[in-house]
UniProtKB/Swiss-Prot annotation:
Cytoplasmic topological domain residue ranges: 1-49, 106-110, 156-164, 208-220, 282-291, 336-360
Gene name in the database record: VRG4
Protein's UniProt name: GDP-mannose transporter
GO cellular component: cytoplasmic vesicle membrane; endoplasmic reticulum membrane; Golgi membrane
Membrane topology: Multi-pass membrane protein
InterPro entries: SCL35B1-4/HUT1, TPT_transporter
Organism: Coprinopsis cinerea (strain Okayama-7 / 130 / ATCC MYA-4618 / FGSC 9003)
Biological process (GO), any one: transmembrane transport
Record's subunit section: Homooligomer.
Similarity annotation: Belongs to the TPT transporter family. SLC35D subfamily.
Localization, UniProt: Golgi apparatus membrane; Cytoplasmic vesicle membrane; Endoplasmic reticulum membrane
Superkingdom as given in the UniProt entry: Eukaryota
Function comment: Involved in the import of GDP-mannose from the cytoplasm into the Golgi lumen.
Entry keywords, A to Z: Cytoplasmic vesicle, Endoplasmic reticulum, Golgi apparatus, Membrane, Sugar transport, Transmembrane, Transmembrane helix, Transport
Record field: transmembrane: 50-67, 85-105, 111-131, 135-155, 165-185, 187-207, 221-241, 261-281, 292-312, 315-335
Amino acid sequence: MSSSETKGRNEEDVAEIKKAIATGAVKDPSNLSAIPPIFVVSGANFSMNFLLLCIQSSVCCACVFAVKKLGIISFRDFDMKDAKMWFPISFLLVSVIYTGSKSLQYLSIPVYTIFKNLTIILIAYGEVLWFGGRVTALTFVSFIFMVISSIIAAWSDVQSALASSIPGASSGVSVGAMQSLFGALRGLNVGYFWMLVNCLTSAAYVLSMRKRIKSTGFSDWDTMFYNNLLSIPVLAVFSLIAEDWGRENLNRNFPAETRNFLLFAIAFSGAAAVGISYTTAWCVRVTSSTTYSMVGALNKLPVAASGMLFFGDPVTVGSVSAVGVGFFAGIVYAVAKNNQKKNERRQAADAIIPMASRKP
């Protein structure tokens, strides 16, 4: 391969990494450790993502065990009864990762992000059914603005995808063009199927985790520990089944010249995931599944804005509008939740004041 081809591939890799960061292509909340995993998976030949996540979870558990031995933190000792209750949550987490990777094989990252943000609405109404939550009109408006933000950000990519798949009128409708179009539509149908499964498993994971935290009385460290520990065997099985463990593929994923640094980066990202896993459990426990998902959608916006300000990403009307509408959606959601809390406190106060003492 010539040096110019190598340079071109590297530039494409960098562009894809920045795109993934800005749109939140990585969807595992317990393993988002920023730069180290991005470095590992950014190589054109890296394909063993389940192995990567398995090693990260193992390192995460080892770090927590070490800190517990030092007496800095405390959490429950491993209990088989608790493990059986929590295992479905860990399995759902791995299912979210797998279905997300399958849908990304057929759909572009912006389209994927639109549907992931639609999951927020699914989670909100799941909380209504499971936890007696309430979706106010203003909260629903914030969901709509978040989806609009994603559509604006993805519009140029959607247009280019449609233009490339639909033959132009001037070129005529040939058999090859029609076959190409039907192939693209077939791929989209498969992609939308995996996307639907991903949205359902994502909602089930977040809602089930909150429900299980309440039923088991887990602390944040308990949640973090069991989530990572029970993910290890599931990730290992997925890796053995879905990934190529041949010598040639292992050498391609872990080349000898960078192997030690790659393993160090994976280990470092696993250690960094401790804080992210803990704060994830804390957020779901003290707020709600909907708020956690909304924050997950909002955290892409500062990254996208910094990409335009500091890293040379193209500043267009669409990109600026998408970030602006997204921030507006966050403000509307915050106002809606604040108003909802005030109403709940007012209703609670009215419930405990005797009728004779109430002012007209």
